[in-house]
Amino acid sequence: MAKLARASALQFGANVTQTFVGAIITIYVINELGVGAFGIFALSAALVKWASIPAVGIRGAVITRMNESDDISPSEYFTTASVLTGAIILVGLLALLGYSPFVEQYLDYSGTQLVGGMFVSNVSFRLVLGGLRGENRVEMSSLYEALWGILSSLVKLALVYTGVGVDALFYGEITSSIVIGIFGVYSLNISFVSPTRSAAISLYSWARYGWLDNLKRMSYSWLDTIILGFFVSTSLVGIYEVAWRISALFVLLPTAISKSTFPTISSLRDTDKLNKVRRILTRGLSVAGVLAIPGLVGSVLVGGDILALYGPSVSSVGVAVSVLVSLSVVRLVECYETLVMQALNALDLPDRTFRIGVIFITTNIILNVSLIPMFGVIGAAIATLLSMTLGSILAVRALPKAVQTLPPVSAIGSQFVSAGAMAVVLFTILNYRPIGQPIEVVLYVLAGATTYGFVLLSLSSNFRERVQQLLSESLG
């Protein structure tokens, strides 16, 4: 468990670093270029993610298969996956360039080549990270992921400062993927060998189901953005993406836990140790909402002030705060769904995840297509919330009986009570002195977080023990 705690802590630290650095750069970029330029990049990123779905399925298969002990070596798996991914990249790139007039009209941006470059470099880099996770080197993968985010942000900052414009956002992603990807390849403990048919079949047997879960993830994260691009301006798409990225902070902890526990749960699925899997899942669920619950409260009280940091192109739009609050609710549900779905994937139950994926994707498409034309960006948030809630219920019901666990009501209740105390403190301070300067936004958020943390530590002995255990195991 010590190794698992260290891996989770490092993954969480990497996610926090990447998110905060990215947020600072995003604030600068939007203030310089406007939220419309950021909306163009968000739509481009959505296209890249959707084009990457087949490759993501291969990457998931690599992580799972390299963790297994069978007659096929990790080197065979990774090499074969590299060849398959290369073929996917070629097809996707040809399609993207072949339909470039339509793509440029949709994006309102004449830079299809840069979109293609981001697609190629991102897919390749993510495969390398998958190889490291397949070797159960979560710490190394987390480190490279954080470095990727930092380098990408710094390149964007430098190029925007020198007047490159929206192209800078693409160059940042491409440069970082290439540079950090090269270091990642050299860190792999595998040799490149001839691809084998048996490895391809084994990868396919997992990916044919696993890709649908990835499609589900993409549907959750990017389908609303794609559909918004047909009905609203790039500025509104940019505002939606800003709110989505702010609320992303709330799911950093469950994301880190799920990534770190995946190899461990995967290694236990063929044994009689499913009770251990249940304990891992219960522990994860007890802390999954630690950031999302106070984050939701904070978005209601100071969400408008946080959005004001991004400049008038964001804060002047009346719907911006409502979008942030709505997406904060979505993120709260996602915290718990993430852990349960990752457990299903790690337990190698592709038939169950397949059914959940089909239902989620169908529901999400129908709701987005129905609600976005009527309610715009708010409709996208509502559609995502309803789809995620349904997916969470189905995921819990799909868990094997030996793994199913009751929700840790006491732990979650303590988090809500602590968030309530935080709300009282923040509301009192805001009534006494409303926020007037950007630095006050940071100070008020820190005051709220401190209040929440102290109250939670005093109320929840289990959370206090978890923190002490994590610090002990991570530092020891």
UniProtKB/Swiss-Prot annotation:
It is found in: Cell membrane. GO terms for cellular component: plasma membrane. InterPro entries: Poly_Biosynth_Transport. The chain crosses the membrane at residues 7-29, 34-56, 83-103, 112-132, 146-166, 168-188, 222-242, 246-266, 287-307, 310-330, 354-373, 377-396, 409-429, 439-459. Pathway: Cell surface structure biogenesis; S-layer biogenesis. It is a multi-pass membrane protein. Belongs to the AglR/Agl15 family. Involved in the assembly of a N-linked pentasaccharide that decorates the S-layer glycoprotein and flagellins. Probably mediates or contributes to the translocation of the dolichol-phosphate-mannose across the membrane. This is Probable flippase AglR.
